[in-house]
Amino acid sequence: MGAGENFCYTFGVLDALDVSGGRIVAHGWVVSLGEHPITELRLAIGDAPEGSVHREFLPSPDVAKVWPQLPGTGHCRFSLQVEVGEEQRRRIASREVISITPWAGDMPGVPLERIFPLSLGAAQAQESCQVGGGDFVEISFSFLALFRLLAGLRRDESVLDAGCGIGRMAFALGHYLDAQARYEGFDISDRFVTSARERFRPLPNFHFRHADIFNRMYNPKGAIRAADFRFPYEDRSFGFAFATSVFTHMLRGDVRNYLREIRRVLRPGGRCIATFFSLDAEARSGIEAGRSTLAFRHKLPDGCLVTSRRAPEAAIAYPEPDLRQMIAEAGLALEVVHPGSWPGRERFLTYQDVFLLVRE
């Protein structure tokens, strides 16, 4: 598995971005995960490139301390101040995406993106910890960048968020999607859905539903089996769907049903980004060598591997051939797999393995 034909693997964080006094000010860090180092950062506002804006990086011992396994983290910080004119400020005010793209040699990497200003309230750290932790805003916009990069997500699309939680992925979408778009999210936690509804109250085209689905970890009193759940949407309703950190907590029958349902509600040509813990040779090697953040050592009768027999839904992995078979049986085409960092890989897109699926 490797990067896409049009980009290379890079990894970084946009710590802060502000637009004031006629300039864009941005701070963050980024490293190359490939053979070539990052040589420059290029700025774009919407579809309009603004050119190269940065070529020198600053010492970053703080990054190296947190990410010692990544190459180049000792000298990867950037601090930008870019003058913007009236037309550029107009595009920013109309919620055009501000992208800072690292370039390694002649290949672009994964963009660092924001929309300014933010108009929705972000979750506080205590609430965000309940859905995986991390910086709520940064994680949301990092996935918006992937949705745009991998699936070409447009601003006017109909979007399904299977497993929406408190609306972490929806947060960036709430700034990106326009009034003609439609967002639908569902989650098995009534408390999470209530929180999301409150946060997105200003957006009438964003809808959140509670699905009372049984899960031993997250909804032990649920009335519906995930393997029997029918998504509450009409056939061919969406152009884009995603399920992040959903299949990583699901047993085989549940995975099969959700894949079939995703196919049912997607229009022909519709795309889906789904994340998994996929066991290929490199992942198995990482587990055996102790490099992996998760040790999938317990095999269940349905063929999946888990980290805990007592709480199997805490983290679930599947052999990659099994995932490919389930995807094909659901009537979806697997376009590409981008590896995750979880088993200690040196080249990755994000933490979990990212699958791009298409309904043909």
Regions found by a protein language model. Give the residues of each.
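Basic, ligand-binding patches in group-transfer machinery
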Residues: 1-118
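Class I (Rossmann-like) S-adenosyl-L-methionine-dependent methyltransferase catalytic domain
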Residues: 113-150, 166-173, 180-230, 271-360
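Conserved class I S-adenosyl-L-methionine
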Residues: 156-165
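Short glycine-centered segments of the SAM/dcSAM-binding site in methyltransferase folds
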Residues: 158, 270-271
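A conserved beta-strand element that flanks and buttresses the S-adenosyl-L-methionine
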Residues: 242
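Short catalytic micro-motifs in class I SAM-dependent methyltransferases
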Residues: 245-246
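Helix-capping/helix-break motifs at membrane-protein junctions
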Residues: 251-252
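A short glycine-rich, Lys/Arg-flanked "PGG" loop and its adjoining helix->strand segment in the class I
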Residues: 256-268
